[in-house]
Regions:
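A short acidic/basic microdomain associated with nuclease active sites
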Residues: 71-93
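Active-site beta-strand termini and strand-to-loop segments that position acidic
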Residues: 94-100
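Conserved catalytic cores of phosphodiester-cleaving nucleases, focusing on short active-site segments
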Residues: 92, 103-111
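An acidic- and aromatic-residue-enriched active-site/binding cleft used to recognize and process polar
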Residues: 85-88, 97, 110-112, 229
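Metal-dependent nuclease catalytic core centered on acidic motifs
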Residues: 2-78, 110-238
Length: 238
């Protein structure tokens, strides 16, 4: 059990705890408790936002595993999820015992995000307490003199948001193309639909565009899923 007396954010999460085998229900009950740990202080919030230590794997692999399995398997206790740390060609194992014979699925995760821009927004959020999710970013200064990050206050119209959603998801898919995986591998792309899907009416248009882009890519996976941070969006791309 997590010791709330620990103040160093690097101690809030261990590899042993993160890779524990859980049912989808157990995993989805555990994930919010981890987020709560990092709400204890501004230091802890910054540690999570900048994906330090094991937070990177938690945000980019374990949380998406929870989102994916909740929607696919619900409360089934015949499915076991096991995050895997390391440099192998998968980030998690799913053992599906619902049929006559257990099936093991290897899942590779990736995130649809502009990584450098996202990091800069998190720096501004940590420094100022808020950051425009849509504004253009400019950086001045150097590593030695200190850099200054400015985010303008502009927004994005509906067409810009939907086109950007297609762009970042397609970019994430492209990053996994032309690599050998196999028929027992799934690919899951997580993106923040809370930001990039302005209207539910846009969902199918974005999905259609992403599906079309996928057809042009050589992806060696049995199934490809797109999962949203909201917990409400799950697409299987055909």
């Amino acid at each position: 059990m997590f010791d709330c007396s620990m103040k160093d954010p690097s101690t809030f999460l261990s590899g042993e705890e993160m890779t524990k085998r859980r049912t989808p229900c157990e995993l989805n009950n555990w994930v919010p408790t981890v987020f709560n740990r990092y709400r204890e202080s501004n230091e802890a919030k910054a540690y999570l936002r900048l994906k330090k230590g094991l937070c990177k794997q938690f945000l980019e692999e374990v949380w998406p595993l929870a989102l994916l399995t909740k929607q696919l398997f619900g409360d089934s206790d015949q499915v076991i999820c096991e995050p895997v740390l390391g440099n192998q060609k998968y980030d998690a194992l799913i053992e599906d015992r619902r049929g006559d014979a257990p099936i093991q699925i290897k899942v590779e995760f990736t995130i649809a995000v502009d990584g450098y821009d996202d990091h800069l927004r998190m720096e501004v959020l940590n420094d100022k307490g808020s950051a425009n999710a849509y504004g253009d970013i400019s950086v001045s200064g150097t590593k030695h003199t200190g850099h200054k990050i400015d985010i303008d206050r502009s927004g994005r119209d509906r067409d810009e948001l939907t086109s950007n959603a297609v762009r970042v998801v397609t970019k994430a898919l492209r990053g996994k193309a032309n690599r050998p995986y196999g028929l027992n591998h799934w690919l899951c792309v997580k993106f923040d639909d809370r930001i990039w899907v302005p209207n539910k009416d846009d969902t199918e248009a974005i999905r259609a565009s992403v599906s079309s882009a996928k057809q042009a890519l050589n992806l060696d996976f049995a199934k490809v899923f797109i999962v949203g941070s909201s917990g409400d969006l799950l697409w299987e791309l055909t």
